[in-house]
Curated annotation (Swiss-Prot):
The lineage of its organism: Bacteria, Pseudomonadati, Pseudomonadota, Alphaproteobacteria, Hyphomicrobiales. Keywords: ATP-binding, Ligase, Nucleotide-binding, Protein biosynthesis. It catalyses: L-glutamyl-tRNA(Gln) + L-glutamine + ATP + H2O = L-glutaminyl-tRNA(Gln) + L-glutamate + ADP + phosphate + H(+). It comes from Brucella canis (strain ATCC 23365 / NCTC 10854 / RM-666). The active site is at K79 (charge relay system), S159 (charge relay system), S183 (acyl-ester intermediate). Its EC number is 6.3.5.7. Belongs to the amidase family. GatA subfamily. One of its GO terms (biological process) is translation. This is Glutamyl-tRNA(Gln) amidotransferase subunit A. InterPro entries: Amidase, Amidase_CS, Amidase_dom, AS_sf, GatA. The keyword Ligase applies. The gene is gatA. Allows the formation of correctly charged Gln-tRNA(Gln) through the transamidation of misacylated Glu-tRNA(Gln) in organisms which lack glutaminyl-tRNA synthetase. The reaction takes place in the presence of glutamine and ATP through an activated gamma-phospho-Glu-tRNA(Gln). The keyword Transferase does not apply. SUPFAM superfamilies: Amidase signature (AS) enzymes. Gene3D superfamilies: Amidase signature (AS) domain.
Amino acid sequence: MSELTALTIAEARDKLKAKAITATELTDAYLSAIDAANDAINAYVAVTHDQARSMAKASDERIAKGEAGALEGIPLGVKDLFATKGVHTQACSHILDGFKPEYESTVTANLWADGAVMLGKLNMDEFAMGSSNETSYYGPVKNPWRAKGSNADLVPGGSSGGSAAAVAAHLCAGATATDTGGSIRQPAAFTGTVGIKPTYGRVSRWGTVAFASSLDQAGPIARDVRDAAILMKSMASLDLKDTTSVDLPVPDYEAALGRSVKGMKIGIPREYRVDGMPGEIEELWQKGIQYLKDAGAEIVDISLPHTKYALPAYYIVAPAEASSNLARYDGVRYGLRVPGKDIADMYEQTRAAGFGKEVKRRIMIGTYVLSAGYYDAYYLRAQKVRTLIKKDFEDVFAKGVDAILTPATPSAAFGLADEVLANDPVKMYLNDIFTVTVNMAGLPGIAVPAGLNGQGLPLGLQLIGRPFEEETLFQAAHVIEQAAGRFTPAKWW
């Protein structure tokens, strides 16, 4: 069975088309793998066995009739942030206990319309707030990777930790994820997988539980660049239900792979060389530069002067939007309800019991920076910084730069329940240092595995592109992948 789960989406698609395997066989192989591994890895918070089998059966019937969709019979995992009709959707929070939506998110509806099969809902940081998947009400996810000669559990990154871990451990062929400040790219880098955050507005947010609405963007996590391109094509669409959705044709991203990068201008930002960055990250970056240079790309030094203000500005804008978005959870119509002596008390008791520590922290920060006395000092100033960050990128792209190459994370995956990080939220927030600028500017960014560190753990590089030019990112990421190879964890679970 494991040879079926080892297939990439592209390989499985070809075998299904050739009728060498059936969608039912493929789905059963994944369900068996999940049942065997999930107690150890905790990637899934709900497994939809019956629904998966009936979707696979319908796929087999369509294949037999010659009516196969672009993702026909491909088993996928769905981050618990996406509404799935009649299926557990709780953003991994206690406050949404028992919530099963009456509607389907646009992203998942697009995937099912193309014939994909749903295996279940994936673990994540509560309301997508976290960088280690330790804030989930359902407990942490364990990274399928371990350091050489060690049995210590590592985090898979966050907030899409379940998505990244499930893809790396072959518990789904690919997964949906979301990225508000790095939540697709950082877990992808920590697990040796590929993750792309599309341009803001490229993929619909409708039916995705909101964290910070001006920053949130859905995208795929997959085993390789080709699979990410295949998934992205199905996920992206114009959606009139999302006012930020952009009416642009969705290109065939897969067709961009293998195109030469000769003459492509790749920018290397000097501000991304941060103090205390491990030497292995700098080495990896140099390696990535060399891979692109060898393939004919032109490397240029660039400056993004406002980079150092991105993280503090992000941690004002994102919590401000979160405090507003999360005001809707009150225990009245759905989810958890804790009784109180009157309605105001019921609200307070429900929110006190329903939200976890990190979510409460961000709601309080957000409410504070939006309060009358501090709005100008914090929120307004952060929005001005955001405009300057966006302008930095615009200036660089105006000079003819096609894409920017940076590290994806400041380190490899760290230990589960790390006491230093648990006691210092700011240290945890520093995980997003290379990724938040991309969300602040609304640009596309892809994380691609580029090597292993001294302990045998995966490290990723990030490519940042011009708005709506994801094809360029797939093209350049494919070059890095071809040079670096693919990375799979040794099975311990």
